[in-house]
């Protein structure tokens, strides 16, 4: 009798899904994330923190692909799975993070912690890409450094403005004043 384990079935499904995608685009996007954004190089250490897929936010395919891509490039990568962001992580979790060159979050937990000073001594990257399909998108494959140039240009426009207006035909109408004391904040 021929039997497959759950892991073998899952790997087969994962491999088939990845094979259907344009591998070149996916690899380009992974390079963008790991090499251009996170600035990782061979022999660096990487912790990938992913949220449980059953919570409905992130698919495991993206963290699995990034793990594989990193390892193929000589980056010492490992994976840690967390629950929902409402569940507080213990101090051991944060101590573990600091043992790596970089941590990439495929978890809402990373977004909640990005402005906190919990004693992080490692580089942190928060990814809002939720699956491999999104990673291989035009946005995911657009050169990271070009995105930084666009962001910096927008920052300069905001810094040199007195008033910011945001509106759309669906009803959004926000107006805010920029003062000198808050125009130099670089948190995002």
Identify what each model region corresponds to.
Residues 14-188:
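Active-site bordering "gate/hinge" segments
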């Amino acid at each position: 009798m021929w039997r497959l384990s759950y892991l073998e079935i899952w790997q087969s499904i994962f491999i088939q899904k990845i094979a259907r995608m344009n591998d070149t685009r996916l690899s380009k996007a992974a390079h963008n994330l790991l090499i251009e954004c996170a600035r990782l190089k061979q022999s660096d250490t990487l912790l990938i923190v992913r949220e449980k897929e059953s919570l409905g936010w992130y698919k495991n395919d993206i963290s699995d692909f990034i793990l594989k891509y990193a390892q193929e490039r000589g980056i010492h990568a490992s994976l840690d799975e967390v629950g929902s962001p409402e569940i507080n992580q213990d101090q051991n979790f944060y101590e573990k993070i600091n043992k790596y060159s970089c941590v990439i979050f495929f978890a809402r937990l990373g977004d909640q912690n990005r402005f906190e000073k919990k004693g992080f001594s490692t580089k942190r990257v928060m990814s809002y890409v939720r699956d491999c399909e999104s990673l291989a998108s035009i946005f995911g494959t657009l050169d990271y450094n070009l995105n930084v140039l666009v962001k910096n240009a927008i920052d300069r426009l905001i810094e040199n403005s007195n008033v910011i207006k945001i509106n759309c035909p669906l009803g959004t109408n926000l107006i805010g004043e920029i003062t000198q004391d808050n125009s130099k904040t670089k948190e995002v």
